[in-house]
């Protein structure tokens, strides 16, 4: 009996994604159009929305917990996402994946796989824009389109927004408040997208780590290479890899 090769597996995933994308393109087009119309009007009529300032921005859990949250910002690296999911399963670990809408549009099967494995989905904007430079209405549209596309594909309600590059301003906070969403940043950054070095990723994700921290990662080969050792380190030090929402709830 012949075993399926990685190349054949990639072809199968690509074919599956293509079929799903064809089935959803029309629905997405209507969604984007309708949200664009809605976002031309202020939220709640003429009433101002209280963004709550920095009180609605989280870089870690409010108090120390026994959990560490790995947050993967995803605009590329589909094959590494599958590797990461398998490694997380091996350690009974959970994570939060902040999805770029344009990536999710091309990788519907992968998005559904993330959710089916018990992980949390978050919003990373649709087109990876600088949210500090957008108006409130532009922020609303960029965030809402991503939210509603993910909901259309998976049924998941998205409550967390991680701005690309951590860039946000008052308008972004007001948009998140209007959408009843929390803005999520990080307490430590592996900078895996730049250095592409598994040993550096490991050190940055483990050195002096405390419960309640949010660790920023991306679906890079070096990150996947280091992930198993990172999770083992957490286990040895009585830390659990949990979703951002679980960490916030336990540390509240």
PLM feature spans:
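Active-site beta->alpha N-cap acidic-glycine motif
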Residues: 46-134, 138, 142-145, 149, ...
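Terminal accessory/targeting
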Residues: 1-71, 86-96, 210-252
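Solvent-exposed, polar/charged alpha-helical surfaces in well-ordered, non-transmembrane soluble domains
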Residues: 82, 86, 109-112, 141-144, ...
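His/Asp/Glu-enriched short active-site or ligand-binding loop at hydrolase and phosphoryl-transfer sites
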Residues: 173-208, 239-251
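Basic- and aromatic-lined ligand-binding clefts that recognize polyanionic substrates
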Residues: 152-168, 173-176, 222
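Loop/helix-junction capping segments adjacent to catalytic residues or to phosphate/diphosphate-binding pockets
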Residues: 78-79, 104-105, 133, 170, ...
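Active-site-proximal beta-strand/loop segments in catalytic clefts of secreted hydrolases
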Residues: 72-74, 99-101, 126, 162-166, ...
């Amino acid at each position: 009996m012949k075993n399926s090769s990685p190349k054949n597996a990639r072809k199968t995933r690509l074919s599956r994604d293509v079929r799903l994308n064809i089935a959803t393109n029309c629905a997405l087009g209507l969604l984007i159009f309708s949200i664009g119309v809605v976002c031309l009007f202020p939220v709640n009529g003429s009433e101002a929305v209280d963004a709550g300032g920095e009180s609605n921005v989280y870089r870690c859990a409010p108090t120390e917990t026994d959990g560490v949250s790995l947050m993967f910002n995803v605009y590329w690296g589909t094959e590494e996402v599958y590797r990461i999911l398998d490694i997380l399963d091996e350690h009974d670990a959970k994570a939060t994946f902040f999805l770029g809408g344009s990536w999710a549009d091309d990788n519907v099967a992968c998005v559904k796989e993330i959710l089916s494995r018990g992980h949390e989905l978050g919003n990373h904007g649709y087109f990876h824009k600088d949210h500090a430079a957008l108006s409130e209405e532009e922020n609303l549209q960029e965030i809402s389109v991503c939210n509603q596309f993910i909901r259309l594909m998976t049924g998941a309600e998205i409550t967390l927004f991680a701005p690309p590059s951590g860039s946000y301003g008052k308008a972004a906070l007001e948009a998140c408040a209007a959408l009843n969403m929390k803005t999520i940043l990080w307490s430590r950054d592996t900078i895996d997208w730049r250095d592409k070095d598994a040993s550096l990723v490991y050190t940055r994700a483990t050195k002096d780590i405390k419960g309640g921290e949010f660790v920023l990662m991306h679906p890079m080969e070096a990150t996947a290479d280091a992930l198993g050792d990172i999770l083992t380190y957490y286990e040895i030090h009585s830390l659990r890899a949990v979703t951002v929402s679980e960490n916030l709830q336990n540390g509240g």
